[in-house]
């Protein structure tokens, strides 16, 4: 059975570099487990995966298997599928179920699998959640719809999410204003977490959001908030080292080089903080390029295809296409990244 590295960060009381003693945080301790668990203690890297398509737009289930193997070999501690970068809104309900079934079949319980379940209404959310949980998914992820604007509307919406999902489904609160256009203040996030017994994880990707992250971690440290796993996003973890310093438990995002996030989290957990920053810096130019609004997914899929992870870089229509100049940029950044990584060894 594949062995996965799991990072346990139950205690944040000892000091470590970068003045973290001021906020009572310490890097997580590494432990080895055969299986990681999706709960409030989850740590490490939950990779947001792409959805592979054939050139004609059909689901590519063979590439799906290959992609899952690649993710597991990279050392991720979990997978999150049918997220924003997974083109979930371009799949039919039947395709979504087929894709989830394929991923779960390939993973075989080696790491937790979380499924994006955000929907315009609660009926499709309930239907998809029941379906994927019956298949063996470990939980679902929910983001607020663009129709909620006030604090009361946002909190009321998630009260209904709790009613819809019920007491047996653990779920992730996704805070990503760039995609949802919904700005959830720190106080709103805290209220949702306090009112949601089965919300075990916050996918924090507000930007700028380091202050919000610190406030939420401090609320937990003071006992004002139940223990909640906090994994961060922002495509390729653009602020991952800083977020780990502030108390994040790891990352839940996507990048064509998931081993970067795994290596950064491992180095940080081992107390090698400067090395974690050095590893991150080597990948940052390409991560930044991949984070571009509009073409970011095309960049990621192009690189994954070049790495042999998926057979085609196809994005289901409507979607962006890379120009020859875009591809030249990627090739240059990749060469420079390879040299920087050689210099690190």
Region locations from a protein language model:
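Short helix-capping segments at alpha-helix termini
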Residues: 105-111, 135-136, 165-169, 195-198, ...
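Catalytic alpha/beta core domains of metabolic enzymes, predominantly
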Residues: 177-284, 290-292
